[in-house]
């Protein structure tokens, strides 16, 4: 695939005092294979959040690699976000690039912080539903969530995430409770697919084309408004 360099300065929006962004990217894991380029994805997306969503520096929280522990991730979600979100006013963006994994029965999806143990999900990882429930309770005006991850139990380089190396891929159910209408959730892959890296761009495939789209490449009708369909 031929790729052009990303340019977060390609499109500039006015500052939006109501915009808040939480950005997490983890390439290096303590107990799992690397999620190639996920840290770069997050650092770049932070620039897009500033330039395209108009998020001010003091309204951005970014956690990368060793800083994206379970404790720091929980602190960002359950302490930092409540101090930033104003009910019915805040336009919230969340970006996560890294590993995800489903429970053995496929009913729960977890986001893996940098120090997670894939064999002890319920103790060391973040339940995705807990993230959603927290955001719902804070009641922001709009929510855009981008997940460059999959839940199949396989890394971007197709290494198994489980120490037991089971010869199966865990398939997550696509049921996660009712999501409010003001939520837009964009994911890199379906429950049984692998989220891949784009070698020549040095980004995840989803992240690269997402950010290219934010530059205006997805604005098919040239109205300067990016819709979900675009």
Set out the residue ranges of the language-model regions.
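Extracytoplasmic/secreted envelope proteins and their assembly/folding machinery
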Residues: 23, 39-49, 60, 70, ...
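Caspase-like (clan CD) cysteine peptidase catalytic core
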Residues: 18, 71-97, 101-160, 229-230
